[in-house]
Amino acid sequence: MTTDPSVKLKSAKDSLVSSLFELSKAANQTASSIVDFYNAIGDDEEEKIEAFTTLTESLQTLTSGVNHLHGISSELVNPIDDDKDAIIAAPVKAVRRKIERDPNAPKKPLTVFFAYSAYVRQELREDRQKAGLPPLSSTEITQEISKKWKELSDNEKEKWKQAYNVELENYQREKSKYLEAKKNGTLPPASLENGPTHAPVPIPFSLQHAAEPPVEKRPHDDDGSSEKKKKKKKKDKKKDKSNSSI
């Protein structure tokens, strides 16, 4: 086995390049598989939840591996001058121009499952905060949302679907108004303050208007009413006396 440092360095470099190539190839295959898997799911919400849960866990594993790779690469010394010339510069990708969205344009409401997820996520956060418990991780939240959605009855799920349909109809009306105003040139100046900042979250009416606790009467209100009754009785007695004297 050779002990020449330059040979060992070249061998290590070749191994690293080969590993990175395999990693890139695997990432491309994973992305393609995700698209195929998502397209094969269809409209089954429960299967989508399972898919998102699996995807979240896989991405966290991948992120951990990439961070580990980054830590190792940052510790490597710079290559010697002879090897610098052998490194092939990676092609510079053209920067995609970000399409600017008109702030005045209405935002499409979140779909049924994402609206439910947003509602439950906020509910979990508030409940744990009130109980003095630490916040859940992203994976734990996703699993809890999946569990709660599966436990919902068909009737409850239908309420979420109805809420989405209401918001969707409202969005379509607002979109028609927006397109008409844009066509006529009557849109207000583009400003984040004028337009919607977040996509509407369709929530069932029953959850929007939960029963509020009855307002307790203040003690002085009762005292005041009883005091008025006493005064009225005194007046009635005076009237009776005056009538009897006549």
From Swiss-Prot:
Other known facts: Present with 19000 molecules/cell in log phase SD medium.
Matching InterPro entries: HMG_box_dom (IPR009071), HMG_box_dom_sf (IPR036910), HMGB (IPR050342)
Origin species: Saccharomyces cerevisiae (strain ATCC 204508 / S288c)
Gene Ontology MF: a single term: four-way junction DNA binding
Annotated keywords: DNA-binding, Nucleus, Transcription, Transcription regulation
Biased composition (Basic residues): 228-238
Function as written in the Swiss-Prot or TrEMBL entry: DNA-binding protein that is probably part of the rDNA transcription apparatus. Acts synergetically with the RPA49 subunit of RNA polymerase I during rDNA transcription. May participate in mutagenesis control.
Region Disordered, annotated ranges: 179-246
Known DNA-binding region: 106-179
Protein location: Nucleus, Nucleolus
SMART domains according to UniProt: HMG
Transcription regulation listed as a keyword: yes
Cellular component terms per the entry's GO annotation: chromatin; cytoplasm; cytosol; nucleolus; nucleus; rDNA heterochromatin; small-subunit processome
Protein's name in the database: High mobility group protein 1
